């Protein structure tokens, strides 16, 4: 599978499956001299890890990261950073009854048709379990971007099902298990999730990720425009179905006067473009919205076929998130950080600043 790496200079390569012994990653391109330890990475992993909220998957993984290369006396050496995370809470028996069935809306069907073989245990490589390494790599990128350029990347839940969550405060985001910034919506979300879990159903969600203090000049037109690279990274996340930058799909109903970000001596009058013009960052906040489909593994019987092409009904057991979009917040933050880190280094390599 050649699609296991992302980035040109800051390059992240991952490997591992949902029910394999571990997940691992190699991060290339980290400049030497960056102070880095397990705690820097663990904080971000703890935000993503499953099993510590009754509203997400009950698979309990500690997600303790181990750095095994690229660090000497707590400082990056400029060589490849190797990281690994052990899988501990594996229950492969939950999938024994459906190993010959294709789960609707999962990667089971396409993986087997492409490769002629698939790991049915928790989805194998196609599982969102793989994103733990992305979050670890993103933690490194976040630290470098904050220390070198004061770039801060944060995200929040902006919609779950039909519940809209207008932004209220960043302080509220870390106070609840939904990454919701609006305290007035928490009780409604809790009631909604409980109802979903009881019925065995799931729901989609929309999240918003914002990068602040991004310098002017990031992005490589024409094919590696910053918005194109961000779209690539976000859409590589499991269950991601759409991405918007700035006003996104709303630009279709705007006029030129409404949409244009007028330029004033002290900056732009608005940010409809989401911080990117001509594929290059313009110094404004980069604003990204991403929508995630409902969890495909649900306990409500559905139609499918088996590996022999015969009609079957399927109920997916196991421990699954009623809404995968919730835990996508730290994952999307990580992917935006990885993309910006790569482009910061590419800018320095080309422009020498």
From Swiss-Prot:
Pathway info: Metabolic intermediate biosynthesis; chorismate biosynthesis; chorismate from D-erythrose 4-phosphate and phosphoenolpyruvate: step 7/7
Cofactor annotation remark: Reduced FMN (FMNH(2)).
Catalytic activity annotation: 5-O-(1-carboxyvinyl)-3-phosphoshikimate = chorismate + phosphate
Keywords: Amino-acid biosynthesis, Aromatic amino acid biosynthesis, FAD, Flavoprotein, FMN, Lyase, NADP
Gene Ontology biological process terms in this record: amino acid biosynthetic process; aromatic amino acid family biosynthetic process; chorismate biosynthetic process
Molecular-function annotations in GO: chorismate synthase activity; FMN binding
Superkingdom of origin: Bacteria
Positions bound to NADP(+): 48
Gene3D superfamilies: Chorismate synthase AroC
Its EC number(s): 4.2.3.5
Binding site for FMN: 125-127, 238-239, 278, 293-297, 319
Cofactor(s) the record lists: FMNH2
GO CC annotations on file: cytosol
Function: This reaction introduces a second double bond into the aromatic ring system.
Subunit description: Homotetramer.
HAMAP family: Chorismate_synth
Family assignment from sequence similarity: Belongs to the chorismate synthase family.
UniProt-recorded name of the protein: Chorismate synthase
Species of provenance: Buchnera aphidicola subsp. Cinara cedri (strain Cc)
Lineage: Bacteria, Pseudomonadati, Pseudomonadota, Gammaproteobacteria, Enterobacterales
